[in-house]
């Protein structure tokens, strides 16, 4: 299996849909190859950005099988398998574990039920004991309605099958987790704007939405950090931050899909209950991305960071 040891820039990839609202596997394969070529070294498939709540069980299995074939063991794959039903999560995670090339599962803190910390420990401990694939916790309180506290994360980091976390919370909480976790437990920020700072603090990297659009710049940012060119790494993050924020100004993944479509990567629209951006929203998004007003209604180049190339 491919491991996350050397993965620092992972894309939480969109699910392309065709004109009949079916998964567009041809466009997905094109996008996978493009992103790997731009410097992404891992993927989350079937996550929030992949609109997983709108996918049926069979669609998810089909998606994961195709995705594994497209990646062909070049980089690690993390597949979303979580739900707010523990037994269902265990069953689906074990089913996904049978798909060759799926390296890890991503299991979200249960939404809607509003479990307390003791309930979260029981939920993830049960999954740890009953599943056959290593997995990461997905802590995203803005979407689930509850937050796994840093002490709970550290406690769960000791369990054999829990290999890491996608953490969407404050940097102070991340510091605590990194300082106190099991040494083999890997920490990824799920907040694009934290990509550089989290890495400096000792996180393994970022699971990113913005890397669909800015993978080349994010790879350069990390490489600059590793080379000791801290001013350049910081400059790239400062350039990226307002653009990263803009990609969430409307319900995600509608903004990133609008940009990808303008770039010719043809990922289609969103499934209900989300809708694609209208023209007014595209203009506002383009402005926030530093583009011409009508840029998202025309053909857009793949490289949107040429102004950084002279540094």
Swiss-Prot record:
Location (main, coarse): cytoplasm
Active site, UniProt feature: 138 (proton donor/acceptor), 166 (schiff-base intermediate with substrate)
* A GO term for molecular function: 4-hydroxy-tetrahydrodipicolinate synthase activity
Instruction: Say yes or no: keyword Amino-acid biosynthesis present.
Output: yes
Which reaction is catalysed here? L-aspartate 4-semialdehyde + pyruvate = (2S,4S)-4-hydroxy-2,3,4,5-tetrahydrodipicolinate + H2O + H(+)
Q: Name one GO cellular component term.
A: cytosol
Q: Which GO terms describe its biological process?
A: diaminopimelate biosynthetic process; lysine biosynthetic process via diaminopimelate
**Keyword annotations:** Amino-acid biosynthesis, Cytoplasm, Diaminopimelate biosynthesis, Lyase, Lysine biosynthesis, Schiff base
Q: Does the keyword Lyase apply?
A: yes
Pathway connected to this protein: Amino-acid biosynthesis; L-lysine biosynthesis via DAP pathway; (S)-tetrahydrodipicolinate from L-aspartate: step 3/4
Q: What is its EC number?
A: 4.3.3.7
InterPro entries xrefs? Aldolase_TIM, DapA, DapA-like, Schiff_base-form_aldolases_AS
Where along the chain is pyruvate bound? Answer: 49, 207
Record's subunit section = Homotetramer; dimer of dimers.
Q: What does this protein do?
A: Catalyzes the condensation of (S)-aspartate-beta-semialdehyde [(S)-ASA] and pyruvate to 4-hydroxy-tetrahydrodipicolinate (HTPA).
Family to which the UniProt record says this protein belongs: Belongs to the DapA family.
Q: Which NCBIfam families match?
A: dapA (TIGR00674)
UniProt protein name: 4-hydroxy-tetrahydrodipicolinate synthase
Which species is this UniProt entry from? Lactobacillus acidophilus (strain ATCC 700396 / NCK56 / N2 / NCFM)
Q: What is the lineage of its organism?
A: Bacteria, Bacillati, Bacillota, Bacilli, Lactobacillales
